[in-house]
A protein has these predicted regions:
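Helical "substrate-binding/catalytic lid" subdomain
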Residues: 57, 61-64, 76
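Mid-chain, well-packed structural core segment of small domains
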Residues: 67, 72-105
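Amphipathic alpha-helical interaction elements
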Residues: 17, 53, 70-71, 96, ...
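Short alpha-helical scaffolding segments that buttress acidic/His motifs in well-ordered protein cores
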Residues: 43-47, 64-69, 107-112
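Acidic, glycine/proline-rich low-complexity segments that act as flexible tails and inter-domain linkers
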Residues: 1-60, 83, 88, 95, ...
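Substrate/cofactor-recognition hotspot
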Residues: 117-121
Length: 149
């Protein structure tokens, strides 16, 4: 059987839905117009099928990479999208690429070292904003000797 562009689009849409959630994908599709429909099809096929379907990395690792890269590049809208959808992802579904607060913290600490403290700082602020919006505000933590390294 020949793999068609439509097959790739179906797989890409499935990956997008697993990682970003049905609601976000439906909103994105609803915004398609004569200017951007080919772009939408291209990213769905190339990025969401061609890249996100590759066997070399699991989806959680890919999402972590997206967070680090988007923070390093200052692509805060995409960063926030992956923070939010990662926190909302089903923790029992590894294909949904769920994230926890500790992982987000580690990504941003690493990003601050390699991409600069301002990127880490902005990423922390956005992550905290999303956590608060989701009702998952982190508890206060000690800043002194009891703070973890």
């Amino acid at each position: 059987m020949t793999d068609t562009q439509e097959d790739s689009l179906r797989r890409g849409l499935n990956n997008r839905r697993r990682v970003l959630g049905n609601e976000w994908v439906e909103q994105s599709i609803a915004r398609a117009n004569a200017l951007n429909v080919q772009f939408q099809r291209m990213i769905t096929s190339y990025a969401w099928d061609g890249i996100w379907s590759r066997p070399g990395l699991d989806r959680r690792t890919r999402r972590i990479m997206v967070l680090a890269i988007t923070a390093a590049m200052g692509r805060w809208e995409e960063f926030e999208l992956h923070i939010r959808t990662g926190l909302l992802a089903d923790p029992d579904d590894p294909e949904a690429a769920p994230l926890d607060v500790e992982t987000i913290e580690e990504v941003l600490l690493q990003t601050a070292v390699y991409a600069g403290v301002p990127a880490g700082n902005t990423g922390m602020a956005i992550a905290l904003k999303v956590l608060k919006e989701l009702g998952r505000t982190p508890p206060p933590a000690a800043f002194g000797e009891q703070a973890k390294p």
